[in-house]
């Protein structure tokens, strides 16, 4: 179920305040955040956020296509190393 329109999107107050002050000064700094649940607002476009993935901070540059999504969607928490496959030197028998 989605969030109520009456409540509006969730954004950490400190995060939004930092972006508003940076927009007023027209400066672009990397904003470090642990708030993966914050929704990306149109004011965030053009800024870079360092989003924590549980281990380190992943830089996320916000574009217009990201508006409405959560910051955590762009900072993966798990490392996918691929499925187990055949070794390169082992060949299949009975080549047809």
From Swiss-Prot:
GO terms for cellular component: cytoplasm; small ribosomal subunit. This is Small ribosomal subunit protein uS19. It holds the Pfam family Ribosomal_S19. GO terms for molecular function: rRNA binding; structural constituent of ribosome. InterPro entries: Ribosomal_uS19, Ribosomal_uS19_bac-type, Ribosomal_uS19_CS, Ribosomal_uS19_SF. Protein S19 forms a complex with S13 that binds strongly to the 16S ribosomal RNA. Belongs to the universal ribosomal protein uS19 family. The lineage of its organism: Bacteria, Pseudomonadati, Gemmatimonadota, Gemmatimonadia, Gemmatimonadales.
């Amino acid at each position: 179920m989605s969030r109520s329109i009456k409540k509006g999107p969730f954004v950490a107050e400190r995060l939004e305040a930092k972006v508003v002050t940076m927009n007023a000064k027209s400066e672009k700094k990397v904003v470090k955040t642990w708030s993966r649940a914050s929704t990306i607002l149109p004011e965030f476009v053009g800024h870079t956020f360092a989003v924590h993935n549980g281990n380190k901070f992943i830089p996320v540059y916000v574009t217009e296509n990201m508006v409405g999504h959560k910051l955590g969607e762009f900072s993966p928490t798990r490392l996918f190393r691929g499925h187990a496959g055949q070794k390169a030197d082992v060949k299949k028998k009975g080549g047809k």
